[in-house]
Amino acid sequence: MVDVCLLGTGGMMPLPDRWLSALLVRCEGHVVLLDCGEGTQISWRYTGWSFRDLDAIVFTHLHADHVAGLPGILYALAFADRQEPVRIIGPVGTAQVVAALRSIVPTLPFPVETLELSGTSELELPGGLLLRALPVTHRIPCFAYTLHRPRGRRFDPQRAQALGIPMTLWHRLQRGETVEFAGQLLTPDLVLGPPRRGITVAFVTDTRPTPELPGFVAGADLLVCEGMYGDTALLPRAIERGHMLMQEAAELARAASVERLWLTHFSPSLTDPEAWLPAIRAIFPASEIGPVHQTVTLRYRDA
């Protein structure tokens, strides 16, 4: 299972009743933070999640409302007695931004590692999560991300017994290893069922719709997507500034056949996002305004 918790739904600047958009994802006790705008550590403290469990911080892009909260988060980790390395991942320029922000938190009890992405990427994170990155269309380099938790194939003990495979080898086959027994090579396919769907969380913000996005987030259990404006008359502004309308987020969710959509990253001018939900749900019924500070658990589905 995978836990998710949205830390805010704001874009551009925090407001008295709206924190900036950021997302926590937890699997097997390991936490990933997607974006880290001003005030992220304050919003985090409403959740009950442990700072010490944070292994990776992932930036979509390097605008201030997505990175300026980094010094506070690093301080929070230090006071939580974090000693293990923390990885910071983002587009080209991330190392320079991290170095600048770290100048006011120069001494930390843990190493900080940076990794810059320059194109479509895939890498493993702690907790068995697979991070995928897709370049999207904003005013500066920006990425959409998915975090995927694979699910192992089901082991068939009756089949293993029928083949005379000793129980001492079962766990290796279940892990996907090929083993040798009685002069034969035994492959996992002999005793494992068909592939099973895992759990996928998609995070898309600060972009115009692109042809690649529906396939990239296809079938996600949860799509967290920006809806900068609700008024379709503001489409020219969205195009100019590299953002999506709430309606465009819903159209993406529908095209990608995701399970549910959380809308986030609202313009400060969008004072009542809830007012637009009827129109949004007419496009994609499983849409909601992102629930801030609520931990939601995503579980494996057999289908």
Curated annotation (Swiss-Prot):
SUPFAM superfamilies: Metallo-hydrolase/oxidoreductase. Its cofactor is Zn(2+). CDD domains: RNaseZ_ZiPD-like_MBL-fold. Pfam families: Lactamase_B_2. It catalyses: Endonucleolytic cleavage of RNA, removing extra 3' nucleotides from tRNA precursor, generating 3' termini of tRNAs. A 3'-hydroxy group is left at the tRNA terminus and a 5'-phosphoryl group is left at the trailer molecule. Zn(2+) 1 binds at H61, H63, H138, D206. InterPro entries: Metallo-B-lactamas (IPR001279), RibonucZ/Hydroxyglut_hydro (IPR036866), RNase_Z/BN (IPR013471). The active site is at D65 (proton acceptor). Binds 2 Zn(2+) ions. Disulfide bonds: none annotated. The keyword NADP does not apply. GO terms for molecular function: 3'-tRNA processing endoribonuclease activity; zinc ion binding. Zn(2+) 2 binds at D65, H66, D206, H265. Keywords: Endonuclease, Hydrolase, Metal-binding, Nuclease, tRNA processing, Zinc. Zinc phosphodiesterase, which displays some tRNA 3'-processing endonuclease activity. Probably involved in tRNA maturation, by removing a 3'-trailer from precursor tRNA. Belongs to the RNase Z family. Homodimer. This is Ribonuclease Z. The lineage of its organism: Bacteria, Pseudomonadati, Thermomicrobiota, Thermomicrobia, Thermomicrobiales.
